[in-house]
Amino acid sequence: MPTTELDGFTFACGDTVDSLTVAYRTYGDYTGSNAVLVCHALTGSQHVRGRADGDDRGWWPDIVGPGRPIDTTEYFVVCANVPGSCHGTDGPPADGPGGDPWGTAFPPVTVPDWTRCQRRLLDTLGVDRLHAVVGGSVGGMNALDWARRYPDDVHRIAAVATAPRLDAQCLGLNAIARRAIRGDPNWNDGDYYGGAHPDRGLALARQLGHVMYLSKASMADKFGRRTATTDTALPADPAAEFFATRDVESYLDYQADTFVARFDANSYLYLLRAMDAYDLAAGRPSVADALAAFDGDALVLSFTGDWHFTAAQSATVADAFRAGGAAGVAHHVVDSDYGHDAFLVDSAAVGPPLADFLAAGTDGAAVTDATGGV
């Protein structure tokens, strides 16, 4: 797995680490003008297309790859695991200066920290100006942050299923997720690496997340009120023998079980905080003012069934790009019942506008604009 060391990295909080390890993947060949940075979502990784050893398919294999919408025979694709995560880039579970895991002594991270980390990584790769930055969910916030902080370094921005900031409902749900982790006795104020991990709290937090990522329609279609047979529940439910176990519970148990095996609880807390804290307009009068220096093309892609980041929120981003003076702006709305997860699973709807936008900007044949229609 490729990594690089960034010397003397200073976080937004003011803390500096002597060296920051950043794990990343590249796909395709760099020609000098074809670099596309892909920003992963909350618990994603650098393996957008899959691991080099073929161990899994990655998190966006139907969008990134040879002959895919982000065609790796045409574009040089870069994806980096963000600071604070646990897929190879330094974060709470990584070894600190003394050789033990950082835990909660790792500096707090922000979305702008991710952006500056990516800029420095690209410098080491010899990439100056990006053809495009593409990101979904909090990765979409990361993409928008590029338009604010490095407007001259990117030609096109594709912000998918995202918003300039979280609303109160999402902030509240994230607070519940954090409390589930911190309320687990094994969390031990984040110092759990030598013993039992707070798997119960992390499982609950992830189950809440999966409910947030689906829509009412998709849950009704996928699960309804059907009952299921299960031997275990995660977390364990002492009252389970008195009640029927529903299909939706079985699904949540499975998702929690697989997630706690691959993710770190402290990293989850750090990344949630970064998403909670982000405000594209911070320190500026408005979102439009924050985006005013970006004069390239912007695609804002949203989904009708997404209540996590709604189409109406995306419309405000598109309006801000227009008011800021971007060369071309389109708000492409996908009619989908998949919920927030649509950007990951509905590749037939996501792929064509994304491919055409990368190729021709907002003039792309499959790119539509819902201005005034949301």
UniProtKB/Swiss-Prot annotation:
Every copy of the AB hydrolase-1 domain together lies at 34-346
Q: Does the keyword Nucleotidyltransferase apply?
A: no
Q: Where is the signal peptide?
A: none
One GO CC annotation:
cytoplasm
Which cysteine pairs are joined by S-S bonds? Answer: none
The keyword Lipoprotein belongs to this UniProt entry's keyword annotation:
no
What residues sit in the active site?
A: 137 (nucleophile), 306, 340
One Pfam family per UniProt: Abhydrolase_1
Q: Report which reactions are catalysed by this protein.
A: L-homoserine + acetyl-CoA = O-acetyl-L-homoserine + CoA
Q: What is its EC number?
A: 2.3.1.31
Binding locations of substrate: 206, 341
The cross-references to InterPro entries, in alphabetical order and at most eight, read: AB_hydrolase_1, AB_hydrolase_fold, HAT_MetX-like
Top-rank EC class of the record's enzyme: transferase
UniProt-annotated location(s): Cytoplasm
* GO MF terms held by the record: homoserine O-acetyltransferase activity
Keyword tags: Acyltransferase, Amino-acid biosynthesis, Cytoplasm, Methionine biosynthesis, Transferase
An example GO biological process term is: methionine biosynthetic process
Q: In which pathway does it act?
A: Amino-acid biosynthesis; L-methionine biosynthesis via de novo pathway; O-acetyl-L-homoserine from L-homoserine: step 1/1
Family to which the UniProt record says this protein belongs: Belongs to the AB hydrolase superfamily. MetX family.
Q: Which PANTHER family match?
A: HOMOSERINE O-ACETYLTRANSFERASE
Primary role: Transfers an acetyl group from acetyl-CoA to L-homoserine, forming acetyl-L-homoserine.
Q: Extract the HAMAP family matched here.
A: MetX_acyltransf
Q: Which NCBIfam families match?
A: homoserO_Ac_trn (TIGR01392), PRK00175.1 (NF001209)
Q: How does it assemble?
A: Homodimer.
What's the protein called, per UniProt? Homoserine O-acetyltransferase
